């Protein structure tokens, strides 16, 4: 009885195995079918031939070498740019801590920081324009005032950063390294700026404090 159509007969001899064909390269196959292929080259100046085709007017190897040199210069430029932003990031206190700051964040923070420092310098210049009584008082207590001003200057950056951390408190931990320090400790640090001022001297003698209170966000 013959097997049903489409069913292999187990008694039949196995079919002969076909050998693996040689590896074909598409470029070779296309060249055999269509003739010479267009030459791949880097961007360069081309000259139109009378036949209608185009031919390069430059040495291909020189074009590729110039391209490699240009790419190396661009990579070095990007590295220098990233190193510059990294140094600027380490100096600017106005940066979000809940996420990685972008280059735009770093530039905005640097702009705000420069503006605050500029306001402090302007306030220091205005403080020198005092009436004779105030000038006499300043001369009599210059040593204590200088010490207080230096202490205030050392704490400005810390207090600015702390105040901005309170503003974005809901976004995550700030520059305290994730220690979970309560927010009221940061507020106490900001308010302690006025504690370095001599009790016999009014707060308006230190325009830096007033300027700082206007520039910082309300917490």
Swiss-Prot record:
It is found in: Nucleus. Germline specific transcription factor implicated in postnatal oocyte-specific gene expression. Plays a key regulatory role in the expression of multiple oocyte-specific genes, including those that initiate folliculogenesis and those that encode the zona pellucida (ZP1, ZP2 and ZP3) required for fertilization and early embryonic survival. Essential for oocytes to survive and form primordial follicles. The persistence of FIGLA in adult females suggests that it may regulate additional pathways that are essential for normal ovarian development. Heterodimer with TCF3/isoform E12. One of its GO terms (cellular component) is chromatin. SMART domains: HLH (SM00353). This is Factor in the germline alpha. It comes from Homo sapiens. InterPro entries: bHLH_dom, E-box_TF_Regulators, HLH_DNA-bd_sf. It is linked to Premature ovarian failure 6: An ovarian disorder defined as the cessation of ovarian function under the age of 40 years. It is characterized by oligomenorrhea or amenorrhea, in the presence of elevated levels of serum gonadotropins and low estradiol. Pfam families: HLH. One of its GO terms (biological process) is oocyte development. Residues 136-148 have a biased composition (Low complexity). PROSITE patterns: BHLH (PS50888). Germ cells. Expressed in the fetal ovary, but not by a range of other tissues. Expression increases across mid-gestation, rising some 40-fold by the time of primordial follicle formation. Coiled coil: none annotated. GO terms for molecular function: bHLH transcription factor binding; DNA-binding transcription activator activity, RNA polymerase II-specific; DNA-binding transcription factor activity, RNA polymerase II-specific; protein dimerization activity; RNA polymerase II cis-regulatory region sequence-specific DNA binding; RNA polymerase II transcription regulatory region sequence-specific DNA binding; sequence-specific double-stranded DNA binding. Keywords: Developmental protein, Differentiation, DNA-binding, Nucleus, Oogenesis, Premature ovarian failure, Transcription, Transcription regulation. Residues 124-151 are annotated as: Disordered. Residues 65-117 form the bHLH domain.
